[in-house]
Amino acid sequence: IALGAAKTYPLLRQQSVAVGQHFRLESTLRQLAFGIEKDLRRAGFCAGQCAGRPLLIGQAAGEAAGSCVIVAYDITRSGQWLTSGEDAGYFGYRLRNGALEGQRGVSQCDGGGWERLLDHDEVRIERFHVAIERGEHGGALARLTLAGRSASDARIGRNLSGSVEMAALP
């Protein structure tokens, strides 16, 4: 019996580690998607007469179309979409070289100052895509796709997709 247990323990341990890696990847991607969806949901909100574009979908140089999104909303309820400073109302997310990056106060998908949102040694982002469609009732609907893979084990990957109603957009 002891010999049988000794043979099965390494297999059980390996499976347990793999389940843990799947769970960590799933949780990391879901948390990231939740934050992006929150900003997409707020896009276009203004407590006054805001000027500018509330939504920009594009891509960084060398990346796929739709792999960068910049949204504006009136986070301070000042009636403006501030473009710079700690109260900036522009929030950007882009795919670049297998990493998802974010920046506040940004107006274009290229350029510097973007920060990686995840540890590149843990997670590689394979796909980030945002597209806008019309929902059943004619309102704007953002479709978000996010796919990532464990940097330590390429067999562990996860794809997420979801839709977000953007009520403040026409």
Language model feature labels by segment:
Residues 58-136:
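Type IV pilin-like appendage domain
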Residues 1-42:
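Aliphatic-rich helix starts adjacent to a transmembrane/signal segment
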Residues 10, 41, 76, 98, ...:
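Residue-level marker of positions within ordered structural domains that often coincide
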Residues 1, 44, 79-81:
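Glycine-centered small-residue hotspots that permit tight backbone geometry or close packing
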Residues 114-170:
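Short linear sequence signals and composition-biased patches located at protein termini or domain-edge surfaces
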Residues 47-51, 67-69, 108-112, 160, ...:
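Sequence contexts marking disulfide-bonded cysteines in secreted/extracellular proteins
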Residues 22, 32, 49-59, 64, ...:
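Transition segment at domain starts
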